[in-house]
Amino acid sequence: MLQYRIIVDGRVQGVGFRYFVQMEADKRKLAGWVKNRDDGRVEILAEGPENALQSFVEAVKNGSPFSKVTDISVTESRSLEGHHRFSIVYS
């Protein structure tokens, strides 16, 4: 099991992107969360098997129908926070 912290740049707020991310995470049985940041980007913390996380990152790069991802950064960690499901964090 690994943890990925992902920062997504582009048109990713106000376009259903967090819901899209949650659906993609649920398809892969990943745990963690997604939230909007004050700087206009979206932050994701996802935990699960490496192959599922890699597939998830590809889906996030492609984005949802109304989003436009321009940049993505991924930080990998072996320390897990022990999430049991994937959720949207509302601020």
From Swiss-Prot:
pH dependence of function: Optimum pH is 5.3.
The keyword Hydrolase belongs to this UniProt entry's keyword annotation: yes
Class of this enzyme: hydrolase
Documented EC number(s): 3.6.1.7
Record key words, sorted: Hydrolase
Taxonomic superkingdom: Bacteria
Active site positions: R18, N36
Reactions mediated catalytically: an acyl phosphate + H2O = a carboxylate + phosphate + H(+)
Family of the protein in this entry: Belongs to the acylphosphatase family.
NCBIfam families tied to this protein: PRK14420.1
The protein, known as: Acylphosphatase
